[in-house]
């Protein structure tokens, strides 16, 4: 299960794989952080800072729902 949460005041999008859990963050791009479990080393989420600035629309609610296509990695 993938959970999305948008913090409008902070302009931050949080994406969690499964239930949110303890993780460390590693910056993988401009204002994009990969969240890795401190217990298993698995990727457990993604954090996108300054989320609305990535789109022409200032109303982030128009961006949702987001279609996501997932592929199983070999």
Please place each PLM-identified region on the residue numbering.
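Small, basic N-terminal interaction modules of short regulatory proteins
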Residues: 1-74
């Amino acid at each position: 299960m993938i959970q999305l949460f948008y913090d409008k005041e902070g302009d931050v999008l949080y994406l969690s794989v499964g239930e949110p859990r303890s993780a460390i963050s590693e910056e993988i791009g401009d204002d994009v952080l990969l969240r890795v479990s401190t217990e298993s080393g698995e990727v457990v989420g993604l954090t996108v800072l300054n989320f609305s600035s990535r789109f022409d629309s200032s109303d982030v609610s128009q961006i949702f729902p987001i279609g996501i296509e997932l592929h199983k990695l070999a």
